[in-house]
């Protein structure tokens, strides 16, 4: 039993996601599957919490069954918590301009259901091309939509200030989305992003 194993390591969260990459047309034809997905997450959340004291977290992914603000709020209505990946959220709900506040606004509205954060950022250049229809979902350039934390549309100093104001005391992880990087390149990116968050005093 997975939850028993998690308990043995004093783990309090179980991360889940639907993990289905698709285009809007495909998604529109999957309403029944989406309903079943909500039901599954709701049942899983109640069971793990009531039986083991483990909180099920839903990690939203862009181009999946649950990615928009409305879709995530339906999860929250089921009393589920979210692993809030600000990059995936902004890439699905925000625009391409520097200082886009979509992720900050959602975080502020639903902080009581967000104990866990993934730090990411979105390339404004790639996002703009996507929104203007210049990139197909399978265009290789879409693999570069996530960028280094200091280079994207999310203002991390504003994000830091919001977390301070909300007195966030949960977990935060720098997550790398660089599918074509070598191990060494990914490691260098991780060090760069860590140094940036330390420089702006988001972390120590």
What is each stretch, according to the model?
Residues 1-84, 91:
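Active-site acidic/histidine proton-transfer and metal-coordination neighborhood
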């Amino acid at each position: 039993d997975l939850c028993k194993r998690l308990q043995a390591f004093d783990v309090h969260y179980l991360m889940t996601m639907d993990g289905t990459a698709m285009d809007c047309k495909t998604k529109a034809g999957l309403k029944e599957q989406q309903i079943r997905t909500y039901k599954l997450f709701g049942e899983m959340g109640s069971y793990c919490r009531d039986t083991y004291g483990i909180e099920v977290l839903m990690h939203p992914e862009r181009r999946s069954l649950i990615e928009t603000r409305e879709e995530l709020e339906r999860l929250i209505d089921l009393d589920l918590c979210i692993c809030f990946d600000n990059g995936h959220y902004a890439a699905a709900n925000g625009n391409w301009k520097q200082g886009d506040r979509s992720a900050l606004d959602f975080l502020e509205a639903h902080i009581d259901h967000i104990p866990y954060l993934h730090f990411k950022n979105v390339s404004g250049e790639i996002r703009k091309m996507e929104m203007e229809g210049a990139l197909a979902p399978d265009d290789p350039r879409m693999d570069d939509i996530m960028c280094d934390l200091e280079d994207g549309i999310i203002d991390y100093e504003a994000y830091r200030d919001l977390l301070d104001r909300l007195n966030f005391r949960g977990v935060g992880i720098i997550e790398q989305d660089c599918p074509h990087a070598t191990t060494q390149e990914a490691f260098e990116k991780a060090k760069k992003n860590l140094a940036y968050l330390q420089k702006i005093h988001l972390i120590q």
